[in-house]
């Protein structure tokens, strides 16, 4: 110590022990919209804007473009924290696509959907539920999936321009990323600007519903089979039967396309994402992996540059184990564990200031295929006479 001799009492504070781990926030929507007549102060172009009341914000979103309709669609489902980037509507679809995809200017300013990457620095939140309602053509969808990977978020995409089941299935072949879900067709709903029923973007409703499920149930529950608010119909005919797999809905789901059904209201039907890896076939498998990665990483900033003693490694391991037990008890995981692998933590590695901690987990699978086995039997007639006399 700085002074070895001291005639008196000194207290040295020792901060050891496990730290509690807080799960990262997941119910944060991020979307890119058009709306040339929106309030320019409320929604400046190419700048991420934090909205805590989507319904009130929709009043300043104008009437043109997709901004007001998307905010209204989200507010029908929930009132999540939302990050919006407004871009100018181009004179052509190609120009609008360029505006939405965005770029980085010579001054380093990010435009279009790339501005979502600045949200955490500028606004203090990271959008994780991503969409571009009404403008998510193949070029936009491809870029949005890249954004989803960068943000560890999840993108909800429409089968843009598809008119039939077969077209939607063919369109799905354009993607392989686990960070996205493809939806076909759209909903229908009442448009207060047109004073008529019109197409209601399914992706906008998916953003709001995903946030609602995260808040009320959890990120381990998929989007499928939850009632959707604020819609009056479906934009295309989709044949669905709960007990028959040979349907339009069954064929779409089999090919990783989430569809829409009407049963006790309107619902998304399908839990699969666009992953080419069977380990992450379901939407909630991907989101579970993302949540755990960010939760575990961000919860251990405190440990960086601490003296690498055995007690530090033990505290990290016990903290992760405690978090796993908590997630299991709440139903977010089936199981999970954490340990130190001696084979990768040899003396040379440790001497270099490197520590490797392993953990595993089992996500909660959605019940996609329920088989009920029905049997006919006469065994309940054996005691017929005795039951009569009784």
Predicted regions and their residues:
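Surface-exposed assembly/interface segments
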Residues: 1-390
């Amino acid at each position: 110590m700085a002074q070895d001799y001291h005639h008196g009492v000194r207290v040295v504070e020792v901060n050891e022990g496990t730290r509690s781990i807080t799960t990262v926030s997941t119910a944060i929507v991020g979307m890119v919209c058009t709306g040339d007549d929106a309030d320019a102060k409320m929604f400046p172009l190419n700048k991420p804007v934090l909205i805590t009341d989507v319904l009130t914000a929709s009043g300043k979103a104008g009437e043109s473009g997709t901004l007001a309709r998307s905010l209204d669609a989200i507010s029908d489902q929930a009132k999540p924290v939302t990050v919006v980037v407004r871009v100018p509507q181009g004179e052509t679809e190609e120009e609008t696509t360029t505006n939405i995809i965005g770029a980085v200017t010579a001054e380093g300013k990010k435009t279009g959907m790339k501005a979502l990457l600045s949200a955490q620095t500028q606004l203090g939140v990271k959008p994780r539920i991503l969409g571009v309602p009404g403008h998510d053509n193949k070029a936009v969808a491809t870029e949005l999936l890249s954004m989803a990977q960068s943000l560890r978020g999840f993108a909800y995409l429409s089968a843009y321009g598809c008119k039939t089941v077969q077209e939607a299935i063919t369109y799905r072949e354009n993607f392989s990323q686990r960070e996205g879900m493809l939806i076909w067709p759209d909903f229908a709903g009442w448009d207060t600007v047109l004073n008529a029923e019109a197409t209601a973007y399914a992706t906008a409703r998916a953003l709001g519903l995903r946030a609602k499920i995260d808040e009320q149930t959890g990120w381990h529950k998929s989007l499928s089979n939850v009632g959707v608010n604020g819609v009056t119909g479906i934009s295309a005919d989709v044949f669905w039967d709960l007990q028959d797999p040979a349907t339009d809905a069954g064929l779409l789901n089999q090919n990783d396309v989430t569809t829409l059904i009407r049963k006790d209201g309107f619902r998304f039907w399908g839990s699969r994402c666009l992953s080419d890896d069977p380990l992450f076939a379901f939407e909630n498998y991907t989101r579970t992996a993302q949540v755990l990665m960010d939760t575990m990483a961000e919860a251990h900033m405190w440990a960086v540059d601490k003296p690498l003693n055995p007690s530090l490694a033990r505290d990290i391991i016990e903290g992760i184990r405690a978090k796993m037990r908590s997630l299991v008890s709440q139903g977010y995981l089936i199981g999970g564990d954490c340990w130190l692998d001696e084979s990768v933590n040899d003396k040379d590695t440790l001497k270099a200031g490197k520590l490797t901690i392993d953990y595993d987990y089992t996500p909660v699978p959605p019940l996609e295929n329920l088989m009920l086995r029905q049997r006919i039997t006469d065994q309940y007639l054996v005691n017929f006479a005795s039951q009569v006399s009784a």
